[in-house]
Amino acid sequence: MKLCAVIIASLLVCVAVASSSDNQKEFAQEKEMTREETQSLGEHEKDDEVTGSEERSCIEEWKTCENDCECCGMSTLCAASWVDGHQIKLCRNEGGKLKKVLHFIQKSVSKIKSCRK
């Protein structure tokens, strides 16, 4: 019975942590400065000529990135992997926090059921 109580308590903690990390990510995105605010107009026009019509607001999945804020979508993260001794950062869809929380709930329920046997 104590194990079941511990599992339920850990489930509640995980849900609280998942919701607070989503709030932190939204806060970081609100505070991020736009390209126009950080560069002069001349530099911005020069970059447009070099890159053409490339979209800068967000990077699509499986393209290179520097941090999570650059990737499109809430569940997409900038994940690092090593290829031939070099670190490459790519935007990857990690399935989101909700999917991980639901999977944890499913595992917890199955453990609670096994506690009762």
UniProtKB/Swiss-Prot annotation:
Record-annotated disulphide pairs: 58-72, 65-78, 69-115, 71-91
rRNA processing among keywords: no
Cellular component, GO annotation: extracellular region
Localisation per UniProt entry: Secreted
Compositionally skewed regions (Basic and acidic residues) per UniProt: 23-55
Main location: secreted
Molecular function terms, GO-annotated: ion channel regulator activity; toxin activity
Propeptide: 21-56
Tissue specificity field: Expressed by the venom gland.
Region (Disordered) residue spans: 20-55
UniProt keywords, alphabetically: Disulfide bond, Ion channel impairing toxin, Knottin, Secreted, Signal, Toxin
Domain free text: The presence of a 'disulfide through disulfide knot' structurally defines this protein as a knottin.
Role played: Putative ion channel inhibitor.
Family from the record: Belongs to the neurotoxin 03 (Tx2) family. 02 subfamily. HNTX-XV sub-subfamily.
Descriptive protein name: Hainantoxin-XV-5
Organism: Cyriopagopus hainanus (Chinese bird spider)
